[in-house]
C-alpha cells in the first residue's frame, strides 16, 4: 500500500472507529483510483475524495412498536444519505439484527458508485433497522413498518430520497411502508421502489439483480469471444437474486449445478432445469432457510454446512451475503478451472479473495455486476414520474442495454494491456461522473 493511501486510510479509521466493512469498501476503491485522483489537480486541490467518504447526512432514530402481546418494543432506525451529486439518494432498506451504522455506510458508499455506473440520475444512500422480520406476525411487521415510516417520511421524497427493499424488506414490507407514507403525506408519488405492480411497481424488478449479473457475465465472455451457453456455473444462495440469476442462466443454456442456503449446498450434476428453478421459489416461501429438500425432490447431492465453491465450474456467482467467498474459496475455484467470478451479492468476496481472483482469473465487482436491481429501480422511478408502465420485454431490453453500458465503462477505464481490470474500471468510471458533478455544483 502506498504511503499516501495508508495515511488517508489511517485518518479515516481514526474518525470511524469500528466500521471495518466501511473501511474495506473505501480502501478497495481508493487503491484502484488513487493515481487517477492524483493526476487531476481539480479533484486533489478541492479534496473531492475526502468529501466522498463522508455521508452528506446520517439520520438515526428510535422505532417504538407494539408486539402481539401488547408489549412495547424498541428498535433503532437509520438512513444514510451518502451522495446526491447526480440525483436523489437511492438505495435499499435492510431489516436485520446485524444492521449497524458502519455497515450501512459501506453499502451507501458502494451504492454511490453503482448508481453512477448505471448512467441513470441517482445518488447513493442506504438505510434500515436492527429489527428482525423472522418469527414476527404480519401485524407485528405492519406496526413496525408504520412506526419506522412515521419518522423516515420527514427525510425522503420522490425528488429527495427514494428507498427500496433489501434483506428483510420485500414486497410486503414495501407495501406497509408506502401505505404509511401515503397516509401521513397525503400524496401518491414514487417515494419507494420495489412496489407491487398494482400500485406503481415495475415489471422484472424481483429478478432484475439476477438477470443483470448474467447479462454482465455475457458481455465479459463476449469480450473474450465466448458465449455463456454450455458453461458450467456455480451460484450461492436461493433468494430473489439467486433465483433471478438461475432463471436467466437456464434460459440462456448454461449448466447450473449448485444453489445453497445456511444449511449447506446442493450439487445437481445434470444441471438445474426450469422446474428446479421454480422450486427455488417454494423453498424461499417455506421460510425455513434450507435447500436440502431440493436434493430429496430432484435426486441431487446435498453437502451440509459447506459452501459451493469446491465444485468444478467455469463461472461462479456469489449471490448470498457479504464476504461469503474468502481467499481459500477463491483458490479452490481457480484450482478447479474456474475462469470468472461474478460478484453478485454486495461485497460478496473478501478483499483477499478479490486480490487473488483479480490476479489469476477474471473478476467482476458487485458495484458493476449486481447493478441490475437498482437499474430497474431507476426505471420504476421513471415510470412513476410519467404515470406509465412498460411491458416486461421493454424493461428487460432496457436492463440489458444498461448492463452493456456498465460493461463498456469498465472496459474503457479498466484496460490493462490485454487484460481488463473490472474492479479498477468500475471504480474509476463511477468516481469520475460523481466527482465532475460535485465540482460543477460547487461542492468543491
Label each PLM-derived region with a short phrase.
Residues 2-25, 220, 332-444:
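Adenosine-phosphate binding glycine-rich loop
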Residues 3, 17, 21-24, 28, ...:
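Conserved active-site and cofactor/substrate-binding residues in soluble primary-metabolism enzymes
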Residues 42-73:
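Structured beta-strand/loop patches that form or line metal/cofactor-binding pockets in enzymes
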Residues 71-112:
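N-terminal cap/recognition module
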Residues 96, 115-229:
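Glycine/serine-rich phosphate-binding loop and adjoining beta1-alpha1 elements at the start
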Residues 193-196, 201-312:
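Glycine-rich phosphate/diphosphate-binding loop of Rossmann-like nucleotide-binding domains
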Residues 264-363, 368:
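Rossmann-like adenosine-cofactor binding region
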Amino acid at each position: 500500500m502506498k504511503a499516501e493511501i495508508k495515511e488517508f486510510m489511517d485518518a479515516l479509521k481514526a474518525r470511524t472507529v469500528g466500521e471495518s466493512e466501511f473501511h474495506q469498501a473505501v480502501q478497495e476503491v481508493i487503491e484502484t483510483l488513487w493515481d487517477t485522483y492524483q493526476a487531476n489537480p481539480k479533484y486533489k486541490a478541492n479534496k473531492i475524495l475526502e468529501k466522498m467518504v463522508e455521508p452528506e447526512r446520517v439520520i438515526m432514530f428510535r422505532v417504538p412498536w407494539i408486539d402481539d402481546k401488547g408489549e412495547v418494543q424498541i428498535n433503532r432506525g437509520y438512513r444514510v444519505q451518502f451522495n446526491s451529486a447526480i440525483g436523489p439518494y437511492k438505495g435499499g432498506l435492510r431489516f436485520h439484527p446485524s444492521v449497524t451504522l458502519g455497515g450501512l455506510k459501506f453499502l451507501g458508499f458502494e451504492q454511490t458508485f453503482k448508481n453512477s455506473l448505471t448512467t441513470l440520475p441517482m445518488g447513493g444512500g442506504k438505510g434500515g433497522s436492527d429489527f428482525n422480520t423472522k418469527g414476527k406476525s404480519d401485524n407485528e411487521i405492519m406496526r413496525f413498518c408504520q412506526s419506522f415510516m412515521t419518522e423516515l417520511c420527514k427525510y425522503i421524497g420522490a425528488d429527495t430520497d427514494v428507498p427500496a427493499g433489501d434483506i428483510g424488506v420485500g414486497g410486503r414490507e414495501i407495501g406497509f411502508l408506502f401505505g404509511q407514507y401515503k397516509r401521513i403525506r397525503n400524496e401518491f408519488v414514487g417515494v419507494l421502489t420495489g412496489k407491487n405492480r398494482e400500485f406503481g411497481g415495475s415489471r422484472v424488478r424481483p429478478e432484475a439483480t439476477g438477470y443483470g449479473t448474467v447479462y454482465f457475465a455475457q458481455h465479459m465472455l463476449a469480450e473474450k469471444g465466448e458465449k455463456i451457453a454450455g458453461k458450467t456455473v456455480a451460484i450461492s444462495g436461493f433468494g430473489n437474486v439467486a433465483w433471478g440469476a438461475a432463471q436467466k442462466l437456464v434460459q440462456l443454456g448454461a449448466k447450473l449445478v449448485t444453489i445453497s442456503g445456511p444449511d449447506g449446498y446442493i450439487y445437481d450434476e445434470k444441471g438445474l432445469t426450469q422446474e428446479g428453478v421454480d422450486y427455488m421459489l417454494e423453498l424461499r416461501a417455506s421460510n425455513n432457510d434450507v435447500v436440502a429438500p431440493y436434493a430429496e425432490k430432484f435426486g441431487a447431492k446435498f453437502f451440509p454446512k459447506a459452501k459451493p465453491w469446491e465444485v468444478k465450474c467455469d463461472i461462479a456467482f456469489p449471490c448470498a451475503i457479504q464476504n461469503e467467498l474468502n481467499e481459500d474459496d477463491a483458490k479452490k475455484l481457480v484450482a478447479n478451472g474456474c475462469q470468472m467470478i461474478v460478484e453478485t451479492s454486495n461485497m460478496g468476496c473478501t478483499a483477499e479473495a478479490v486480490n487473488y481472483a483479480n490476479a489469476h482469473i477474471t473478476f467482476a465487482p458487485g458495484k458493476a455486476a449486481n447493478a441490475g436491481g437498482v437499474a430497474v429501480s431507476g426505471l420504476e422511478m421513471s415510470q412513476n414520474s410519467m404515470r406509465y408502465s412498460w411491458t416486461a420485454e421493454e424493461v428487460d431490453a432496457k436492463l440489458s442495454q444498461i448492463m452493456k453500458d456498465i460493461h463498456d465503462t469498465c472496459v474503457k477505464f479498466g484496460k490493462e494491456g490485454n487484460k481488463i481490470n473490472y474492479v479498477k474500471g468500475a471504480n474509476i468510471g463511477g468516481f469520475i461522473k460523481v466527482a465532475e458533478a460535485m465540482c460543477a455544483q460547487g461542492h468543491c
